[in-house]
Amino acid sequence: MGKNVVVLGTQWGDEGKGKVVDLLTERAKYVVRYQGGHNAGHTLVINGEKTVLHLIPSGILRENVISIIGNGVVLAPDALMKEMTELEARGVPVRERLLLSEACPLILPYHVALDNAREKARGAKAIGTTGRGIGPAYEDKVARRGLRVSDLFNKETFAIKLKEIVEYHNFQLVHYYKEAAVDYQKVLDDVLAIADILTAMVVDVSELLDNARKQGELIMFEGAQGTLLDIDHGTYPYVTSSNTTAGGVATGSGLGPRYVDYVLGIVKAYSTRVGAGPFPTELNDETGEFLRKQGNEYGATTGRSRRTGWLDIVAVRRAVQINSLSGFCMTKLDVLDGLKEVKLCIGYRMPDGREVDTTPLAAEGWEGIEPIYETMPGWSETTFGVKEHSKLPQAALNYIQRVEELTGVPIDIISTGPDRDETMILRDPFDA
């Protein structure tokens, strides 16, 4: 029986991970975020009530679940407090259910200022970041100058370290980017005001997870963003700053890599992308607008409209390889309802005429690529809210089967609407 399950996106994010994690955590004891920060936007709909989480794991609404923010996550204290306050106002006892790794790097105002200054300076070459300081915080981590949650235990030392790093970043902000300096005293006061709240939630995450594993507890790891945004394996440089793939679980939580039992890849029935970067199947026509409107494709974090296109099997196959996927959950199948035909990208035609069935690595390699499509009949019947596999339209079943054939991975879960119960679990990852 699988006990440790990873849930991650197979595309460019926004696949519907939050809903699936929330659904499957009915059985889990722990839900762990292992990378990213509050640039994620995980939307849950339970009995018609919508909740958008950015930093706190999607298991927080379950009474039986302990939610953990692992060391691979960059943590913005102000964003965490805002999210905690909103949830507590709705009666969710966050402080009883949420734990933090002391090794989480902190995102502070100078990271946000740098993020926005750089995007502004890039002009037409902007990456399309969320402007929340994620990249600069990871830079400080790798440069070994960043502050971490553990630094909050000694406030005097924290103040000294903070002064040094504020001076360092302010020099760059003022003299290179010609932007305003960050106020050291305000940053210090704001962080110290909530330091005790954060340190009270600190645990040894690696030890906790290892003990839970030994006791046979069910653990779920919640990925943010998507495989094709991975810092190493994504469409570089149009990527995020963390490892969004299954490999990030071990480094971002402290669980040994051999202890992952099942990797669930969330795949949207079509493709979307927010921000700049390659997108071979993008549709800038009526069909693209149809998908955007029907799928309500607007970012949960930024509110930006998402780019839309047909499902790219070539890119998804790359996700299968990198993540050693055990199964898929297909989301938003209902968005395709009403289309006369649906298409799957099964290969790329390169600028020199060659046909390939693998993805390039760097963004430059995607330039001039044309998708090669396989066209299938669409369906006029609704799939929205359907909860039995046999009651799906035959054309929709054919589409699902073809995705399985082309990827070599079974679709174990099908989502037909935003609500928790608008889902078919054909094979439970915890039992696989």
Swiss-Prot record:
Pfam families: Adenylsucc_synt
Biological process (GO), any one: IMP metabolic process
Transmembrane segments: none
UniProt keyword annotation of Metal-binding present: yes
Keywords of the record: Cytoplasm, GTP-binding, Ligase, Magnesium, Metal-binding, Nucleotide-binding, Purine biosynthesis
Chain residues that bind IMP: 14-17, 39-42, 130, 144, 225, 240, 304
SUPFAM superfamilies, A to Z: P-loop containing nucleoside triphosphate hydrolases (SSF52540)
Cofactors (names): Mg(2+)
Enzyme Commission designation: 6.3.4.4
Main location class: cytoplasm
CC annotations in GO: cytoplasm
Annotated positions binding substrate: 300-306
Gene3D superfamilies cross-referenced by the UniProt entry: Adenylosuccinate Synthetase, subunit A, domain 1, Adenylosuccinate Synthetase, subunit A, domain 2, Adenylosuccinate Synthetase, subunit A, domain 3
Involved pathway(s): Purine metabolism; AMP biosynthesis via de novo pathway; AMP from IMP: step 1/2
Reactions catalysed according to its record: IMP + L-aspartate + GTP = N(6)-(1,2-dicarboxyethyl)-AMP + GDP + phosphate + 2 H(+)
GO molecular function: adenylosuccinate synthase activity; GTP binding; magnesium ion binding
Compartment(s) where it occurs, according to its Swiss-Prot or TrEMBL record: Cytoplasm
Class in the EC hierarchy, top level: ligase
Annotated binding of GTP, by residue: 13-19, 41-43, 306, 332-334, 415-417
Residues given in the record as Mg(2+) binding sites: 14, 41
Free-text comment on the cofactor: Binds 1 Mg(2+) ion per subunit.
Assembly and binders: Homodimer.
Family: Belongs to the adenylosuccinate synthetase family.
Official protein name in the record: Adenylosuccinate synthetase
UniProt source species: Yersinia pseudotuberculosis serotype O:1b (strain IP 31758)
Phylogenetic placement of the source organism: Bacteria, Pseudomonadati, Pseudomonadota, Gammaproteobacteria, Enterobacterales
Gene field: purA
